[in-house]
Design a protein with these regions (language model features):
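Contiguous, structured surface segment used for ligand recognition
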Residues: 20-162
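The substrate-binding groove and active-site-proximal loops of carbohydrate-active enzymes
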Residues: 122-123, 165-175
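Bacterial Sec-dependent N-terminal signal peptides
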Residues: 1-29
Length: 175
């Protein structure tokens, strides 16, 4: 009987330790769903206390976007990523890099690429980069305090479906 109690206690302790992992997984099942999500085989990017958010120097709007993302990551994980302006062509590791890409067709379109070395969010304009940040922000678990967030490797391409943003509320037909 004593051996059975010890075995049950050891099993419960092992199960409790296994459930207390310090890693949380991000999920790209966000609303609205991006137009194209392609996951790749490979290790995820680890969002932890050592991550840097980089943006092109002399771009105040992307600096503001970087600070916005840093504040959100701090709220969700208690890590405060530093933001840094980088020169054109400068490479940074373990970073979320914001940038502009005139090759993207839509002004509000973006491409979010995740590799084990980092994340890049490129848009044709600063607005496109902002919408890419929103997709990344929504994929991070809301409660990941002190945990390393594993962001799956892959690429997301998205742009607005319509040329306008808005809604129509017909109060006359609301019964």
């Amino acid at each position: 009987m004593r051996k059975l109690n010890h075995a049950l206690l050891a099993g419960a302790l092992a199960l409790a330790c296994a459930s207390c992992t310090a890693e949380k997984e991000a999920n790209y099942q966000v609303i609205p769903l991006p137009q194209e999500v392609s996951l790749t085989q490979g290790n995820p990017f680890k969002l932890n206390e050592n991550v840097l958010i980089a943006y092109p120097e002399n771009n105040a709007l992307l600096q503001r976007n970087a600070e916005f993302l840093s504040e959100y990551i701090q709220q969700a994980t208690n890590y405060a990523p530093k933001t840094k302006a980088i020169a054109a062509g400068e490479q940074v590791k373990n970073a979320i890099v914001l940038g502009l890409d005139p090759g993207i067709a839509n002004k509000e379109g973006y491409v979010l690429t995740t590799t084990p070395e980092g994340i890049s969010i490129n848009g044709q304009t600063e607005n496109g980069v902002f919408y890419g940040i929103q997709t990344l922000r929504k994929s991070i678990p809301a409660e990941a305090k002190g945990a390393t967030v594993l962001i799956p490797a892959g690429e997301i391409k998205d742009e607005p479906r319509f040329s306008y943003r808005g809604m129509h509320l017909d109060v006359g037909r609301h019964f």
